[in-house]
Amino acid sequence: MSDIHEHKILILDFGSQYTQLIARRIREIGVYCELWAWDVTEAQIREFAPNGIILAGGPESVTADNSPRAPEYVFNAGVPVLGICYGMQTMSEQLGGKVIQGVGEGEFGYAQIEMLAQSALFKDIEDAVNSDGKSLLDVWMSHGDKVSAIPEGFVAVAKTDTCPFAAMSCEEKRFYGVQFHPEVTHTRQGMRMLSHFALDICGCAANWKPSSIIEDAIERLKKQVGDDEVILGLSGGVDSSVVAMLLHRAIGKKLTCVFVDNGLLRLNEAKQVMEMFGDHFGLNIVHIDAENRFLDALKGEADPEAKRKIIGRVFVEIFDEEAKKCVNAKWLAQGTIYPDVIESAGSATGKAHVIKSHHNVGGLPDDMELGLVEPLRELFKDEVRKIGLELGLPYNMLYRHPFPGPGLGVRVLGEVKKEYCDLLRRADAIFIEELHKADLYNKVSQAFTVFLPVRSVGVMGDGRKYDWVVSLRAVETIDFMTAHWAHLPYDFLGRVSNRIINEIDGISRVVYDISGKPPATIEWE
């Protein structure tokens, strides 16, 4: 088996919102990479031994005092370096070039760059040709400052009308700088540029692919846990489901999955989880029906944050009780993924190389004395989904819309009651079913129904009804940081509303949420 970590790229983060996207793109090309904070030491870089280094973007100005700089060793390590946006500016400044503040000449959004010279980074890449026969590329800019003089040994590779050095290179040292963002889809040929850098310039092999990741994970799991028993809290979500499948392949019946049905799941979800993992895949699952326990704990509580804490606390209590019954278990498995590792540093950058394992379950008792198994901690969410498919998990389960950890506990506004949850489950199932039927489900980023604790007058036949209100919510977003409400067709919304009111006794009115984020959040609580 080839070593999937043999060839690797180091990405240094200066705080850009796009930095994780760079890492995901390099992984998509088939090369392993890690994302570290910019203030890494020479010793840490030497130990990691990257085949190439990417200096990512950031919000600071290179011209400001005490702004972040790449470690000097980056330029003496003998490996290719690619500077993106701020990364290009700090590369230029540190190697003897000059950066000036852009006064009213920043570039934000779509731009077209004109190629001035040949470069390995742009080999055979072209979007259009101008009247002078020069190649043009469509790119995405987001910068105020700009390089005004490039370092000795560099050549200008591309320009725009307001940016004389939109790209630069020193082919001898294999140093490259681009003022635009190749990692975003708006830069049409961005993936080809990153592929040239990782595969051709750095000489990496594309070993990072789902089948190899699975093979590597299983081997590492076997080495880590040996013949010991492992317990896992299986929620039916993407991360814990993929962890369950990896461990099942690695250690079989030595894995015990604890599935806690808190009564706050989607319609028939508990049944589906048990049938898929227990009956179909043959995993060893302990099913805990804890609906009454959760609802009793939530009784009388209307505050969203308090509800979240109660749900988390009760889950931990139940999981702890079940874990103690597994007297031979030596390990606790968790679905920690790479963004969790990065974010646990307490900042957007995250020094992933010095982060210790952490409990993402939310405060499991220290006296459990179990080792931690986190087979997904190197992976982004899209990679987890891809290996889930390779492991045989169904597409519809892996690519479902996000569902909050507290479940319906934060989609029933105010106090949570069984009656409300049952009504909401059925209404939500109708909404999702109709989205699938209309081929709209995969065209929105997230869709769900919210139960409003208010009654409204309705008419049914010759009689009046005085029943509950639900709100439909559907949004379109790229990163869930901002979102637009989805402009679903009126006839579709009418069909969903009619079905919910006619088929569910207890709901008299359906409304549609047309709030964006900001100012609203995606979830109501």
Swiss-Prot record:
Pathway annotation: Purine metabolism; GMP biosynthesis; GMP from XMP (L-Gln route): step 1/1
Domain of life: Bacteria
Pfam families, sorted: GATase (PF00117), GMP_synt_C (PF00958), NAD_synthase (PF02540)
SUPFAM superfamilies per the UniProt record, alphabetical: Adenine nucleotide alpha hydrolases-like, Class I glutamine amidotransferase-like, GMP synthetase C-terminal dimerisation domain
GO MF annotation terms: ATP binding; GMP synthase activity
Domain (GMPS ATP-PPase) ranges: 208-400
Record has 4Fe-4S as a keyword: no
UniProt keyword annotations, A-Z: ATP-binding, Glutamine amidotransferase, GMP biosynthesis, Ligase, Nucleotide-binding, Purine biosynthesis
UniProt-listed PROSITE patterns: GATASE_TYPE_1 (PS51273), GMPS_ATP_PPASE (PS51553)
E.C. numbers: 6.3.5.2
Residues at the catalytic site: C85, H181, E183
Enzyme class: ligase
Residues covered by the Glutamine amidotransferase type-1 domain: 8-207
CDD domains assigned to the protein according to its UniProt record, in alphabetical order: GATase1_GMP_Synthase, GMP_synthase_C
Transmembrane intervals: none
Reactions it catalyzes: XMP + L-glutamine + ATP + H2O = GMP + L-glutamate + AMP + diphosphate + 2 H(+)
Binding site for ATP: S235, G236, G237, V238, D239, S240, S241
Cellular-component GO terms for this entry: cytosol
PANTHER family assigned to the protein according to its UniProt record, in alphabetical order: GMP SYNTHASE [GLUTAMINE-HYDROLYZING] (PTHR11922:SF2), GMP SYNTHASE-RELATED (PTHR11922)
Purpose of the protein: Catalyzes the synthesis of GMP from XMP.
Subunit details: Homodimer.
Identification of the protein by name: GMP synthase [glutamine-hydrolyzing]
Species assigned in the record: Shewanella sp. (strain MR-7)
